[in-house]
């Protein structure tokens, strides 16, 4: 109800805005289901963090490769280069994964993951965000 008020009643937030909520409890399956339904029905993008996960920056961890959200031009170029016709041809990343929440990727957006490689120094991998 609080989220509906911010988006609809008071019109403080628009569909282009991200609402980040920090809670003291763990995020449960019911909350994730509600956030998925909210995105599917109204395109309201809400990220809920457990405060314990904010004690360190996951993006600075040495095991987490660099993630970059592609803009629309890069997305078009990526799809042309790799002949991607359908989004189902791209591996997905859940919008509720810690890295996806940290970079704020929305469902339908593509992120480029730059991983270290023994043979090529770095390798690029791409993932599409799923709701």
List where the protein language model places each region.
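Short, compositionally biased
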Residues: 121-131
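Extended boundary segments
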Residues: 34-78
């Amino acid at each position: 109800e609080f989220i509906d008020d911010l988006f609809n009643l008071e019109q403080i937030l628009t569909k282009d805005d991200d609402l980040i909520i920090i809670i003291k409890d763990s995020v449960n399956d019911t909350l994730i289901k509600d956030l998925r339904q909210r995105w599917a029905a109204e395109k309201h993008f809400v990220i809920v963090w457990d405060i314990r996960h904010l004690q360190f920056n996951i993006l600075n961890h040495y095991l987490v490769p660099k993630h970059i959200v592609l803009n629309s031009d890069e997305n078009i170029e990526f799809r042309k280069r790799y002949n991607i016709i359908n989004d189902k041809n791209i591996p997905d990343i859940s919008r509720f994964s810690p890295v996806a929440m940290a970079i704020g990727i929305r469902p339908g957006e593509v992120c480029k993951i730059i991983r270290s490689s023994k043979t090529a120094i770095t390798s690029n991998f791409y993932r599409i965000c799923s709701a």
